[in-house]
Amino acid sequence: RKQWAQRWARGFESYYFRQSNYEREHMPSVFLTSDTHFGHAGVCRFLREDGTKLRPWDNPDEMDEEMVKRWNETVRPNDKVYHLGDVVINRKALSTLSRLNGDKVLIRGNHDIFRDDEYRKYFRELRAYHVMNGMILSHIPIHSDSLGRFGTNIHGHLHANRVMLYNENRSQYGLENTYIDTRYHCV
């Protein structure tokens, strides 16, 4: 599980599982993605901690078109996609979802505020979370007290940030007090 999560964490905004080239050609792949924020002008202005832009586009129309293009170059119509929330920011952008390949499941995020029937036009399932292969998929990272039975939480919401641990005892050994919690992996 840990080795898979490390490989996955190095991916771009999604990752697919594949066993062989034959399976990739003949069997559906599984993709995870999150925080597409279709239609969101503000996300084009978000900055990383180092001051660089989180997304390279200047406006949401340009961003949406390029993301749809990249999605459909990667995801085939029969592939399964778990979208871990914050799919669109406004109703106008909902229609963008009809252009996306894949059998899609939405794990609802804090910006997914529209009625269920508005999302069901584009997603086969709507969920609060999903358990898969001993991992829990969610939008917001789950509380660490609930993580024990899963081991790993694949989530969205944090964009370029990571879940950190604080340990006051580490400073007595000259180590940083905060460090990355490797049980969490942000898409």
Locations of regions flagged by a protein language model:
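Aromatic (phenylalanine/tyrosine) cluster motif
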Residues: 12-17, 22
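Catalytic phosphate/metal-binding cores of nucleic-acid and nucleotide-processing enzymes, i.e., regions
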Residues: 22-187
